[in-house]
Amino acid sequence: MAEGSRIPQARALLQQCLHARLQIRPADGDVAAQWVEVQRGLVIYVCFFKGADKELLPKMVNTLLNVKLSETENGKHVSILDLPGNILIIPQATLGGRLKGRNMQYHSNSGKEEGFELYSQFVTLCEKEVAANSKCAEARVVVEHGTYGNRQVLKLDTNGPFTHLIEF
């Protein structure tokens, strides 16, 4: 979590899943909707704030992929890389919202272009980290991701309300 009064540069929400399916493109006329999906693993929702830069990304990826939140069959907590489990990354600008009166405001979020670039680089770093992990390669772990800037439909089966918020 962010220490003291330090302003966070990013926020990530981690949620275990048994199965997750994300619509990345809606149906359009005769063209069917496009979906990505993962089996057992981790859904990572991510939001970047003003002031975030690419130097933050390796720390985020290292922390999120190595935190021991995933439960094995014998009840031991391990990282998603050690499980090994699939990963679905979803851009989630609403994680940057602040309540003002009865409305949510998102003035702290990074701009669209900066957010898109950071999100794209974050996804690439996650893919590289998973590809470099021998357990993940052997288990054919899948890293999927949503589309930055679009509304997306999420279908999620989870093994309990097991959700963690981490600020960077």
Curated annotation (Swiss-Prot):
GO cellular component terms attached to this protein's record: cytoplasm
InterPro entries xrefs: Daa-tRNA_deacyls_DTD, DTD-like_sf
Catalysed reaction, written as an equation: a D-aminoacyl-tRNA + H2O = a tRNA + a D-alpha-amino acid + H(+); glycyl-tRNA(Ala) + H2O = tRNA(Ala) + glycine + H(+); D-tyrosyl-tRNA(Tyr) + H2O = D-tyrosine + tRNA(Tyr); L-alanyl-tRNA(Thr) + H2O = tRNA(Thr) + L-alanine + H(+)
Subcellular location: Cytoplasm
Pfam families, per database record: Tyr_Deacylase
EC top class, as a word: hydrolase
Principal subcellular localisation of the protein: cytoplasm
Stored SUPFAM superfamilies: DTD-like (SSF69500)
Gene Ontology MF terms in the entry: Ala-tRNA(Thr) deacylase activity; D-tyrosyl-tRNA(Tyr) deacylase activity; tRNA binding
Enzyme Commission (EC) number: 3.1.1.96
Bridged cysteine pairs (disulfide): none
GO BP: any one term: aminoacyl-tRNA metabolism involved in translational fidelity
Keywords: Cytoplasm, Hydrolase, RNA-binding, tRNA-binding
Residues spanned by motif Gly-transPro motif, allows the protein to recognize chirality of D-amino acids: 160-161
Record's comment describing the protein's domains: A Gly-transPro motif from one monomer fits into the active site of the other monomer to allow specific chiral rejection of most L-amino acids except L-Ala. The trans conformation of the motif is maintained by Arg-151.
Assembly mode: Homodimer.
Function: Deacylates mischarged D-aminoacyl-tRNAs. Also deacylates mischarged glycyl-tRNA(Ala), protecting cells against glycine mischarging by AlaRS. Probably acts by rejecting L-amino acids from its binding site rather than specific recognition of D-amino acids. Catalyzes the hydrolysis of D-tyrosyl-tRNA(Tyr), has no activity on correctly charged L-tyrosyl-tRNA(Tyr). By recycling D-aminoacyl-tRNA to D-amino acids and free tRNA molecules, this enzyme counteracts the toxicity associated with the formation of D-aminoacyl-tRNA entities in vivo and helps enforce protein L-homochirality.
Family per record: Belongs to the DTD family.
Name this polypeptide is given: D-aminoacyl-tRNA deacylase 2
Record organism: Homo sapiens
Lineage summary: Eukaryota, Metazoa, Chordata, Craniata, Vertebrata
